[in-house]
Design a protein with these regions (language model features):
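Short amphipathic alpha-helix
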Residues: 17-29
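Donor-nucleotide binding loops and adjacent catalytic segments primarily
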Residues: 44, 49-53, 177-182, 186-234
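A generic structural motif
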Residues: 28-37, 94, 216-221
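Conserved nucleotide-sugar phosphate-binding/catalytic loop shared by glycosyltransferases and other
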Residues: 4-12, 29, 34-79, 164-165
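Active-site-proximal region of nucleotide-activated glycan assembly enzymes
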Residues: 115-178
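An amphipathic, basic-hydrophobic alpha-helix
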Residues: 69-98
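An aromatic- and histidine-rich active-site surface loop
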Residues: 44-48, 98-117
Length: 234
């Protein structure tokens, strides 16, 4: 009988650190029996995404290392400490074989708690430029999976590094054009231009493209993912 692989995923705050982890969970499940748990933020969009994938979700406190003045800089160290303590509790209770993170400050104290317990930590780097959270987790990580070869240079101290390409769920490759045309009321003939700054949109991108839309709409059918709450600004 195959041993069940226990995997603790950490990340969130936005869709960026969440969707690669869901893809990894899906891929591992196809290889053999797995049991997963996800530690995320208390206010990010990841809880709905994780629970929809059938993974138990637990919110833990998260701080942020800001490089600018904010009153939250005085309280965030306590949030980070609390996140580490609660993360340690989950590690001791769940006893994962491996911890997997794709970024986000909520993951940092969990990564170091895992290292203290001797649990391997796998880091996913899906952007060209590593964020601060991933750079902070690098010393606690046993292995790195990266998309862009240029980003590997920032993680030379991680002993195992592997170019994995895009980490996406199978459903992305199984899209149905006819269903998309019906949902967005598209004509199947003209090309479609998708504008997105990620799951939360990007205010700068949203505003920058406004003068260009009339010209683009002469040649393309435009789908603009603005991010939740950003549509009113357009």
């Amino acid at each position: 009988m195959a041993t069940t692989l226990r995997v603790l995923f950490t990340g969130g705050g936005s869709g960026g650190p969440t969707t690669p982890l869901l893809a990894v969970n899906e891929a591992l499940g196809a290889l053999g029996p797995t049991e997963s748990r996800f530690l995320g933020t208390t206010s990010g969009p990841e809880q709905a995404m994780v629970e929809e994938a059938g993974i138990p979700f637990y919110a833990i406190p998260a701080g942020k290392l800001r490089r600018y003045f904010s009153w939250q800089n005085f309280t965030d160290p306590f949030r980070i400490l609390a996140g580490g303590i609660i993360g340690l509790k989950h590690l001791l209770q769940f006893k994962p074989h491996v911890v997997v993170s794709a970024g986000s400050f909520v993951s940092v104290p969990v990564a170091y708690a895992a290292r203290a317990l001797g649990i391997p930590q796998v880091l996913l780097q899906m952007d060209v430029l590593p964020g601060l959270a991933n750079r902070l987790m690098a010393p606690a990580s046993s292995a790195l999976g990266y998309y862009f070869p240029a980003s590997e240079r920032a993680f030379r101290r991680i002993p195992e590094r592997k170019h994995v390409g895009p980490v996406v769920r199978n459903s992305v490759y199984q899209g149905d054009p006819e269903r998309a045309n019906q949902r967005f009321q598209l004509n199947p003939d003209p090309p479609v231009l998708l504008i997105t700054g990620g799951g939360q949109g990007a205010v700068g991108l949203n505003r920058a493209i406004q003068p260009l839309l009339p010209t683009w709409q002469e040649h393309f059918q435009v789908i603009h993912l603005t991010g939740r709450g950003s549509k009113a600004d357009l």
